[in-house]
Amino acid sequence: MSFQAYLENIKSKTGNGPAEFRNLAEEKGFTQNGQLKPEVKAGEIVAWLKEDFDLGHGHSMAIYALLKGIKDENSK
């Protein structure tokens, strides 16, 4: 599955896109000034997204990659 397909599925399931997840991560204290804090681990993001949005591991890791800056909205 392409990264774009992950983002589309996540938006369909949760109603939230990349910008919304960035804002939510900031509110939760995972990011600061748009950057994932160094002490935040992937498992914390996965647990949050599973708990609050019922996302699976793969979809949660896509959001983690987005927050970490590994991928962006234009990644394939």
Residue ranges and their predicted role:
Residues 1-76:
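Charge-dense, helix-prone N-terminal extensions
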